[in-house]
Amino acid sequence: MAVFKVFYQHNKDEVIVRENTQTIYVEGQTEEQVRRYLKDRNFNIEFITKLEGAHLEYEKEHSTHFNVENAE
């Protein structure tokens, strides 16, 4: 399993505005699995990145909302 950081907007019908970007952390096998897990939400997904090593540790230490959802 890997942890993915998902950058998204709350409404997929609106134009993306950088200042409104939100993030969520999801644990899954692949990016595709994470996308399937989130498909029923009304999110406009901008970008998904896999967190590993030092990057993952940094997010754990410095993110005020590091709560991981499980995509399974």
Curated annotation (Swiss-Prot):
GO cellular component annotations of the record: DNA-directed RNA polymerase complex
KW Cell membrane (keyword) present: no
Domain of life: Bacteria
GO MF term (any one): DNA binding
Keyword terms of this UniProt record: DNA-directed RNA polymerase, Nucleotidyltransferase, Transcription, Transferase
EC number, as in UniProt: 2.7.7.6
One Pfam family hit: RpoY
Residue stretches in coiled coil: none
Entries under InterPro entries matching the protein: RpoY
HAMAP family given in the database record: RNApol_bact_RpoY
The family this protein is said to belong to: Belongs to the RNA polymerase subunit epsilon family.
Function: A non-essential component of RNA polymerase (RNAP).
Subunit description: RNAP is composed of a core of 2 alpha, a beta and a beta' subunit. The core is associated with a delta subunit, and at least one of epsilon or omega. When a sigma factor is associated with the core the holoenzyme is formed, which can initiate transcription.
The protein, known as: DNA-directed RNA polymerase subunit epsilon
Provenance organism: Staphylococcus epidermidis (strain ATCC 35984 / DSM 28319 / BCRC 17069 / CCUG 31568 / BM 3577 / RP62A)
Gene that produces this protein: rpoY
